[in-house]
Every structure is written in C-alpha cells, then in structure tokens.
Regions:
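Active-site beta->alpha loop and helix N-cap motifs at the rims of alpha/beta catalytic domains
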Residues: 2-157, 162
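Hydrophobic, aromatic-enriched interface-forming segments
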Residues: 147-166, 170-187
Length: 187
C-alpha cells in the first residue's frame, strides 16, 4: 500500500486559491459585511434568478465591492429587454461596484422577454468592451442541459471562443456543480 502524503497548511492554501462562491441578492441582504466571512478579494458570483430585479444585482455587487470582494454578476440573456437595458446595467455595475468581470448565461428555460435569445447575442453587442469588461465567463454544461442539445452546446462554445479571440475578451467556462469527475474530464 502506497503511503499517503501528509496534507500541510500550504497544501490547503494552494487548493483554495482562485476559488469562488455564489450568492443570491436576497441572501446577501442577511450579511452585514462579507469581509467578516471571506478573505479579501474573494470572487463572489451574484446570481440572476427568475423574477429577480437588476437593481438587486447592482446593490449586491456594490456591497461586495465595498466589503473588499470581487463581484461577478450573472447576466441572463433572456431576461434582458434590449441593448439599452444592458448598457445601463453595465454602466451601473461598473460605476457603482467597480465590476470588471461578468458571467453571461442564457437563462436556462426562461422565456425570452426581449431581444436576446442566448448569451452569444449579448457578447456580440460590444457593450461589455464599451464598459471596460474584458473578463467574461460563459456557461459550460459537461453533464448536458435539458434546454439545449449537446450538439448545440458544443457549437455555441466554439462560437463564443472564436468571438472571444476576435474581440479580445478573456473568456472562461464556468459550470454548475458536477458530481461525476469522469464526465467532466471527458468533456
């Protein structure tokens, strides 16, 4: 039997580098100061759930910024009315919360309420770059999606990757919780 290596504090610190946490705007109202619970500069994703108000996202991002965190708001394409709303939302996120990174999602099975049908349609507007946002997360689905075929998911990721290269966006893929490492590694 192979001897296991003793885990050191340094090993634990290394394993927890560059991690992020996620919060809803409603849950954020229960936290007086995020710095009481998280190390400074922790990346905190701010969800965009069905029926949520963009003002709540802005306020949560602002609180996170004031508490020394890196707020990464989720922008759900199918929940946005039009480019004007997106432009105003980005303007507020940047000016009030110093946001420089966002996660663009389609919005799951949400009914499209405006001009954006998917995340790439948001990426194509050029509004992220206009507001100085060049680090952009997009959704990855290693275990598939009930809303989109596997082939369309693959094609969409390739399109987003090509757009990111063309537009100079620093794009990364963020996934939901995955419990089968083999699926993720094969993906």
């Amino acid at each position: 039997m192979k001897a296991s290596k003793k885990v050191t504090v340094q090993d634990i610190k290394k394993a927890t580098e560059d991690w992020s946490i996620e919060i809803t705007p409603v849950a954020a109202t229960k936290i007086e100061n995020f710095a009481d619970y998280l190390p400074l500069n922790t990346t905190v994703n701010v969800t965009c759930l069905p029926g949520s108000d963009p003002i709540e996202t802005i306020q949560t991002a602002e609180q996170l910024n004031n508490d020394g965190m890196n707020a990464v708001p989720h922008l759900a394409a199918r929940s946005l009315v039009d480019q004007l709303e997106l432009d105003n939302l980005l303007k507020e996120l940047v000016s009030r919360a110093s946001v420089n990174e966002v996660l663009i999602i389609g919005g799951g099975g949400k009914k499209q309420i405006g001009e954006f049908s998917d995340s790439i349609s948001v990426l194509r507007t050029g509004l992220l770059q206009k507001h100085g946002i060049t680090k952009v997360g997009v959704a990855g689905h290693p275990e598939g999606s009930t809303d989109i075929s596997d082939e369309r998911l693959k094609t969409a990721l390739l399109e987003k990757n090509e757009l990111a290269k063309t537009e100079g966006l620093n794009m990364y893929i963020e996934t939901q919780f995955c419990f089968d490492s083999e699926i993720v590694l094969n993906w």
